[in-house]
Swiss-Prot record:
Keyword set, alphabetical order: Antibiotic biosynthesis, Methyltransferase, S-adenosyl-L-methionine, Transferase
Entry EC no(s): 2.1.1.288
This protein's encoding gene: dauC
Family: Belongs to the methyltransferase superfamily. DnrC family.
Name recorded for this polypeptide: Aklanonic acid methyltransferase DauC
Length: 220
């Protein structure tokens, strides 16, 4: 699948789900967004970029942390997500937030624009995630930092599902899955550099990052 076709599908999927995103069923992205903000520790006055901001799982907690002296910029490829986030920002009376439709793979900001770049379950959707990570390093100021979350990718299991669930999926369903959606293909397609901790460290160091820290959280 070509990157342009894939991105159109991603945009359409998130656009169509924007009105109910993380509002039906069990909450997931909202608590995980708060968790990411807690880990990344934005402080008063900082400039924050939230990539793939969705409806604001990270955006709003970060805005509270940086206060009126700071600012949080949210970007998302799906216009529907930006519209929903903008509505909520207005309802909350937040003036330290800006939102725009933008492809997170090629952020259009000058060098050293931000103190913190965050991405909650968004980096994994970028066809050239490693290239994007390198570009984020360029728009971070000296001493800036990046924080992002991802499901655990393991060969033979499905992303976003605990490994224990894989044996519960009917074999008949697995046999009829398109090749590109089988576990091994998903791991290859969605960033094999996330499969092992050492791969992640090596990738981030190659993009110019240092003093790396990892943590694992379970939701639910």
């Amino acid at each position: 699948m070509q990157d342009s076709s894939y991105k159109k599908q991603v945009t359409q999927a998130f656009d169509q789900s924007s009105s109910t995103y993380d509002r039906l069923g069990v909450e997931f992205f909202t608590p995980m967004g708060r968790r990411l903000v807690d880990i990344s520790e934005p402080v008063t006055g900082e400039r924050v970029l939230d990539i793939g901001c969705g409806r604001g799982a990270c955006l709003f907690p970060a805005a509270e942390k940086v206060g009126s002296q700071g600012c949080v910029h949210g970007i998302d490829i799906a216009p529907g997500m930006i519209e929903e986030a903008r509505k909520e920002a207005t309802e909350r009376g937040l003036r330290n937030i800006s939102l725009m439709v933008m492809d997170a793979e090629t952020p259009g900001f000058p060098a050293r624009s931000f103190d913190l770049v965050m991405g909650s379950y968004s980096v994994i959707f970028l066809p050239d995630a490693v290239g994007a990570l390198a570009r984020y390093a360029d728009i971070l100021d000296h001493g800036g930092r990046i924080a992002f979350t991802s499901p655990v990718f393991r060969a033979g299991t499905f992303p976003f599902l605990p490994p224990e669930f894989t044996p519960l999926i009917p074999q008949a369903l697995l046999e009829h899955l398109p090749e590109q959606w089988r576990p091994e293909a998903l791991v290859r397609r969605f960033n094999s550099w996330l499969e092992r901790a050492e791969d992640l460290v090596r990738t981030l160091e190659g993009c110019g990052y240092a003093r790396l820290r990892q943590s694992t959280s379970r939701c639910g």
